[in-house]
Amino acid sequence: SVGFKAGVKDYKLTYYTPDYKTKDTDILAAFRVTPQPGVPPEEAGAAVAAESSTGTWTTVWTDGLTSLDRYKGRCYHIEPVAGEESQFIAYVAYPLDLFEEGSVTNMFTSIVGNVFGFKALRALRLEDLRIPNAYVKTFQGPPHGIQVERDKLNKYGRPLLGCTIKPKLGLSAKNYGRAVYECLRGGLDFTKDDENVNSQPFMRWRDRFLFCAEALYKAQAETGEIKGHYLNATAGTCEEMIKRAVFARELGVPIVMHDYLTGGFTANTSLSHYCRDNGLLLHIHRAMHAVIDRQKNHGMHFRVLAKALRLSGGDHIHSGTVVGKLEGEREITLGFVDLLRDDFVEKDRSRGIYFTQDWVSLPGVLPVASGGIHVWHMPALTEIFGDDSVLQFGGGTLGHPWGNAPGAVANRVALEACVQARNEGRDLASEGNQIIREASKWSPELAAACEVWKE
């Protein structure tokens, strides 16, 4: 017969290749696949590989003009999920040529762009990605990273302390700056714009930036410590976002902030490049992450969003608390915390890490624990997150019965007590409450905080 063999054919003939040996340059993905009833797992896994790479629903004439073997995604392994009927982990390898260099946006458009609406699947979740060295090297990554940040701030050997200014909406710029000053003066390292503070009618961005800068210079002069306030540069357009970052730089402040999921990866990478070029640290908030990562069987796990952020660029990122008001299992959380901070992370399924990830000296990101935490949580947080982290107490600072500055004092005293106890070899997990109680004997501010929030 003339021409090519037209018609719909099974994906698994082309895209399910259990003998395939993965290459060092491949991007590897682990998908949790829930096929529709009657769809075999091989076909579902192959369909994912096809739809997220070169495949389309029918054979097309132009297939003959490409080298499919060079460009197709391959489902190379399938395993059942323990304890779940009809769920499988499908491992897919993508050739590096399918992706634009230095573009998280393109990486996600390819891997998770179309395939999640696929009819043959009831649900699909991207659990993990292995980013090959060759691709990592096309990204700038975090503007500065953990070590450079410590050097800029001159703060070593302990976690950093932050506080989100509340009420998050409705304060005037002057009163907002006042709250910032009180917290920093009391002993915090950072204060933070809430993620939804951008530039609203009750407080325009330029006024807020000005009063916050005034607050942090005053606090710096009085405490002899370097202080920061995360000025949220997130805006409706990239141009406006950069304009805000430029103004922050002109004020001489150390750090700005961005909501990377609502702002988008393209905007985030642009801001990250600007921050590295101009010596600004970049704090990242993950507003909207639960829309993507909360469902256990559909969407994307946060560890994928965290890896993507490390590529796109950010010096801090919110990553759950393990102890506060928002959910997060301890081992899983520590898994992606390591993926953010460490240079090399071994595959470890008990911590949700499906692939060994080598970051080839891309700078690390500080995880930020934030949400419903207070002084009694301090020993656990110090133990779980270690020194390279930012602990953020919003209500846990501003809710102090004596006011903001004493709230900040209470947190700083609690932190210093925990760090000292740890350095003396005491066990924070078992003696935590004891350590806080001892410290509160000589700090009335901490004692008052201990009264308000029970253990």
UniProtKB/Swiss-Prot annotation:
- PTM N6,N6,N6-trimethyllysine: at which residues? K5
Q: Annotated site (Transition state stabilizer), which positions?
A: K325
Q: What else is known?
A: The basic functional RuBisCO is composed of a large chain homodimer in a 'head-to-tail' conformation. In form I RuBisCO this homodimer is arranged in a barrel-like tetramer with the small subunits forming a tetrameric 'cap' on each end of the 'barrel'.
Q: Which reaction does it catalyse?
A: 2 (2R)-3-phosphoglycerate + 2 H(+) = D-ribulose 1,5-bisphosphate + CO2 + H2O; D-ribulose 1,5-bisphosphate + O2 = 2-phosphoglycolate + (2R)-3-phosphoglycerate + 2 H(+)
The record lists substrate as bound by N114, T164, K168, R286, H318, S370
Per the UniProt record, the source organism is Lupinus angustifolius (Narrow-leaved blue lupine)
Biological process according to GO:
photorespiration; reductive pentose-phosphate cycle
Q: Which family does it belong to?
A: Belongs to the RuBisCO large chain family. Type I subfamily.
Residues with N6-carboxylysine modification: K192
* Bound cofactor: record note: Binds 1 Mg(2+) ion per subunit.
**NCBIfam families in UniProt:** PRK04208.1
Subunit (UniProt):
Heterohexadecamer of 8 large chains and 8 small chains; disulfide-linked. The disulfide link is formed within the large subunit homodimers.
Briefly state the protein's biological role.
RuBisCO catalyzes two reactions: the carboxylation of D-ribulose 1,5-bisphosphate, the primary event in carbon dioxide fixation, as well as the oxidative fragmentation of the pentose substrate in the photorespiration process. Both reactions occur simultaneously and in competition at the same active site.
The record lists the lineage as: Eukaryota, Viridiplantae, Streptophyta, Embryophyta, Tracheophyta
A cellular component annotation (GO) from this entry: chloroplast
Q: Which InterPro entries match?
A: RuBisCO, RuBisCo_large_chain_AS, RuBisCO_lsu_C, RuBisCO_lsu_C_sf, RuBisCO_lsu_fd_N, RuBisCO_lsu_N_sf, RuBisCO_lsuI
Q: Does the keyword Metal-binding apply?
A: yes
Binding sites annotated in the UniProt record for Mg(2+): K192, D194, E195
Q: How is it modified after translation?
A: The disulfide bond which can form in the large chain dimeric partners within the hexadecamer appears to be associated with oxidative stress and protein turnover.
Q: Which UniProt keywords apply?
A: Calvin cycle, Carbon dioxide fixation, Chloroplast, Disulfide bond, Lyase, Magnesium, Metal-binding, Methylation, Monooxygenase, Oxidoreductase, Photorespiration, Photosynthesis, Plastid
Q: What is this protein called?
A: Ribulose bisphosphate carboxylase large chain
Alphabetical list of Gene3D superfamilies matching this protein: Ribulose bisphosphate carboxylase, large subunit, C-terminal domain, RuBisCO large subunit, N-terminal domain
Q: Which gene encodes it?
A: rbcL
Q: Where in the cell is it found?
A: Plastid, Chloroplast
